Amino acid sequence: MRKITSVLVLLASAIPGLALPPAPMPRRSPELTIYEPSGKTTLLSAFRGKVVVIEFLFIASPHCLRVAQTLNRLEQELGPGGLQSVAVAFPAPGSDANGPLVTYIVHDLKLTYPVGYTDSTSVDKYLERGRADVLNIPQVVVIDRSGMIRAQSGAKPGDPKLEDEASLRHLLAPLLKETPPSDNAAKTEPLATTRKTQ
């Protein structure tokens, strides 16, 4: 585990001159398909109307797993008020992302919120990342009730505030007070579906 983590850190710092350019905010969250260990798929838009915090993580990264536990605490406390934590694992050199691995970390860390996985291409597209851009891991994205991205980790070294529990609470408090979108507004958005993969 330590060897894999060291390799990931080395790879992340191998091209210091290149970085993920800051994406404009707020901006509408793109759609994202999340694969669940059960074989079902869930669209990110299924959570519209809630304040969503997504962590894109490497399963082999202890730091990513610590952030996942932070989101678990926030979900348990703030979930009734409209917070939805989501974790999405994706592959890295020396670190796969699949149903059995996701199931293992969910049970090991006792995570109570949705945890799934996807491929690196889908993550890059969602984050608007170019192939040569250095991606800070974990990537934490905060989406408001209307589906707008209000905060994102971005380029290395990222935004430590999005990995800190107290800072996240401060950021989330006003978002949770915002009014959820009306039913009419929701009808103008693409419908989210949950289905079994083939």
Residue ranges of each PLM-predicted region?
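Sec-dependent signal peptide recognition
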Residues: R2-V9
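Short, internal strand/loop/helix patches
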Residues: V102-Q139, I143-R145
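N-terminal "domain-start" segment that seeds a small globular fold
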Residues: L18-L44, Y113
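Short active-site neighborhood of thiol/selenol oxidoreductases, capturing the structured segment around
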Residues: S45-P62
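N-terminal signal peptide c-region/cleavage motif recognized by signal peptidases
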Residues: A14-P16
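Structural microenvironment flanking redox-active thiols in thiol-disulfide oxidoreductases
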Residues: L65-L109, S120-K125, Q198
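Hydrophobic beta-strand anchors of alpha/beta hydrolase catalytic cores
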Residues: V53-I54, S85, V140
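Thiol-/selenol-based redox modules, centered on thioredoxin-like
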Residues: Q139-Q198
